[in-house]
Swiss-Prot record:
Matches recorded under CDD domains: Ribosomal_L16_L10e (cd01433)
Keywords noted in UniProt: Ribonucleoprotein, Ribosomal protein, RNA-binding, rRNA-binding, tRNA-binding
Cited Pfam families: Ribosomal_L16
Protein family membership: Belongs to the universal ribosomal protein uL16 family.
GO biological process: translation
Protein name: Large ribosomal subunit protein uL16
GO cellular component terms, semicolon-separated: cytosolic large ribosomal subunit
Domain of life: Bacteria
Subunit structure: Part of the 50S ribosomal subunit.
Keyword field contains Methyltransferase: no
């Protein structure tokens, strides 16, 4: 699973995912990309599930770039615990995704556009947000 090696703070404040993405909103490496149409927290398990879905479909004929990383820890208090007495313990690691952010990029060695779009479509089913598939050079 993806998670940072070290963090400055174990339990950071919650970050807003409202608004548009300021960075990573251009297709840099691949021919096709999966772009977020709405903001959300995406967990390390969801990122890994999407990566596995893409790589299994492409079967070594392509390359996948993951442009998001779960830097933020979300905390949760145990069940049936009264309010107060501090913040809960870190439960999972999430990536903050805003509208317009390029999540994954794909390039197929056989230059098959069909394979690239199908791999991204399979990955989009593993994510909790609405996404769109964009070709390199097209407007995001």
């Amino acid at each position: 699973m993806l998670m940072p090696k070290r963090t400055k703070y174990r339990r950071p404040h919650r970050v807003s995912f409202e608004g548009k993405s300021k960075g990573k909103n251009v297709i840099a490496n691949g021919n096709h990309a999966l772009v977020a149409k709405e903001g959300a927290f995406i967990t390390n398990k969801q990122i890994e599930a999407a990566r596995i879905a893409m790589t299994r479909y492409m079967k070594r004929t392509g390359k996948v770039w993951i442009n998001i990383f779960p830097h933020l820890s979300l905390t949760k208090k145990p069940l049936e615990v009264r309010m107060g007495s501090g913040k809960g313990s870190p439960e999972e690691w999430v990536s903050v995704v805003k509208t317009g952010k390029v999540l994954f990029e794909v390039k197929d060695t056989t230059n098959s556009s069909k394979v690239e779009t199908e791999a991204l479509r399979l990955a989009s089913h593993k994510l909790p947000i609405k996404t769109k598939i964009v070709k390199k050079g097209a407007e995001i």
